[in-house]
Amino acid sequence: MKDQIRKWLVEQVGEEDQTLLETIYADYVSTVGEQLTKAEVEIARGDFAALDVTAHTLKGSTSTVGDTETYDAVMALRDAAKASDSAAAQTALSRLLELTAQM
């Protein structure tokens, strides 16, 4: 678990229930993985409206667990979607995949 996320989760729910912390983190990692897979397809199709919705979902997920580093990359993806900029979207997605590979 990324230290930044662990610290944020402990502040929110305490550290007494390690199972809860691990469950929240596992759900987060799963959700992010699913959304990034969707984003890849949406970029390939040039479906920027759908990509914006996916990026919005990712924004919520990252902010819910205090993952500010990934949140910043998600915002770059969302900006690219709003601008219908496939090159910027691909760059942002590559950064997100790099960040999430560390999870």
Regions found by a protein language model. Give the residues of each.
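Two-component system phosphorelay core
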Residues: 1-53, 57-59, 63-103
